[in-house]
């Protein structure tokens, strides 16, 4: 009788295994571009797999103000999705974008697949800002983007929890970092966004 149960368990696990393999494949597709960022001069050098597995070049946001935030669906700060979506809609037309990077590093609070995460964010918070594939954002296995962010931010050091927010100015440099406790709609965050949006877009570098 043990064999049928074993087979059933295996078959049940196939969708989960497929989701995991899909995420790994998506990251493998982007690894070359990630490695190019070892000598990066901006976080916008990096290419990540988006939530749908397609490569997402952060370079498309050159000249914009970018917030990169690691997210989780089962965290005490998950409700910040609502505020993030509101500021995204408020400032989007002025050249502001949010990049969500789901991660399971802290408390195992993002256990789902990329499809699960997309459904959760859309259903519960109406999220429309770009979401990336689930990634490692802390520890020795963290993706190169997060190595760059944590080393080049004015406040250096590894991130401690979900919903840490990095702000990148129109010049492509990391200019501010806000922790989990800082609400995305707080005066400190919105004032910084508005200050960065008021700055001119740098002229393209001469060939």
Regions found by a protein language model. Give the residues of each.
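Bacterial N-terminal signal peptides
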Residues: 12-26
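N-terminal "domain-start" segment that seeds a small globular fold
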Residues: 29-59, 144
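N-terminal secretory signal peptides that target proteins for export/translocation
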Residues: 1-10
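Proline/glycine-enriched tight loop/beta-turn segments at coil->beta junctions
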Residues: 61-65
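Structural microenvironment flanking redox-active thiols in thiol-disulfide oxidoreductases
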Residues: 77-142
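Amphipathic alpha-helical repeat scaffolds
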Residues: 70-74
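Thiol-/selenol-based redox modules, centered on thioredoxin-like
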Residues: 144-207
């Amino acid at each position: 009788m043990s064999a049928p149960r074993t087979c059933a368990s295996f078959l049940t696990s196939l969708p989960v295994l497929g989701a995991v393999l899909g995420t790994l494949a998506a990251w493998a597709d982007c690894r070359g571009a990630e490695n190019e960022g070892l000598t990066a001069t901006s976080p916008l050098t990096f290419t990540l797999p988006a939530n749908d597995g397609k490569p997402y070049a952060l370079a498309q946001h050159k000249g914009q103000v970018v917030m990169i935030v690691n997210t989780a669906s089962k965290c005490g700060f998950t409700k910040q999705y609502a505020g993030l979506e509101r500021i995204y809609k408020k400032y989007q037309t002025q050249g502001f974008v949010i990049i969500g990077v789901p991660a399971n590093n802290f408390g195992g609070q993002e256990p789902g697949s990329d499809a699960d995460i997309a459904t959760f964010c859309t259903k519960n918070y109406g999220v429309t800002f770009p979401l990336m594939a689930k990634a490692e954002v802390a520890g020795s296995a963290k993706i190169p983007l997060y190595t760059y962010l944590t080393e080049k931010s004015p406040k250096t050091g590894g991130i401690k929890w979900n919903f840490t927010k990095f702000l990148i100015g129109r010049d492509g440099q990391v200019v501010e970092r806000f922790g989990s406790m800082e609400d995305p709609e707080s005066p400190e965050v919105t004032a910084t966004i508005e200050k960065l949006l008021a700055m001119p877009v740098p002229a393209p570098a001469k060939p």
